[in-house]
C-alpha cells in the first residue's frame, strides 16, 4: 500500500473497521462506533454516541478550535459517513469479507469502498 505515515495509519484504521461485522440488518454498529470514538478521543476530539437504537448509535465528534473555550467558536465542518454494510456471502469472496486483509496491493473486505474507507480517511 503506502509508506506515508498518515496513509499507513488510515490503512490500519480501515483494516480494523472492516473486521467489525456491521451488516445491516441488524446494523450492530455500536462496537465499531466505540472504536472510532476512542481513536478520535486520542487525537483530542470530544466524542458522544447518540441514537434511538442502542446498537446503532451515531458518533458525534467535536474538535475545538485552538484557544477556543466554546466548541461552537469558529467555522464548522460537518463530515458525514456510515459504517454499516450490506450482507456478504463469504463463499463468493476470494478474501474473507471481514478480514481487512491486504493482498496484491489492495485492502479487502466489506466496506473497503463503501464507506468505511472514507470514514477511516
Predicted features, each with a name:
Residues 2-115, 119:
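Acidic/His- and Gly-rich active-site-bordering loop/insert found
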Amino acid at each position: 500500500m503506502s509508506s506515508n505515515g498518515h496513509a499507513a495509519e488510515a490503512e490500519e484504521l480501515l483494516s480494523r473497521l472492516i473486521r467489525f461485522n456491521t451488516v445491516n440488518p441488524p446494523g450492530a454498529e455500536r462496537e465499531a462506533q466505540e472504536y472510532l470514538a476512542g481513536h478520535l478521543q486520542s487525537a483530542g476530539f470530544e466524542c458522544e454516541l447518540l441514537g434511538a437504537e442502542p446498537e446503532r448509535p451515531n458518533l458525534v465528534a467535536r474538535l475545538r478550535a485552538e484557544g477556543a473555550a466554546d466548541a461552537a467558536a469558529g467555522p464548522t465542518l460537518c463530515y458525514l459517513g456510515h459504517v454499516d454494510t450490506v450482507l456478504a456471502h463469504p463463499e463468493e469472496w476470494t478474501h474473507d469479507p471481514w478480514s481487512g486483509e491486504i493482498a496484491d496491493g489492495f485492502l479487502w473486505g466489506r466496506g473497503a469502498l463503501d464507506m468505511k474507507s472514507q470514514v477511516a480517511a
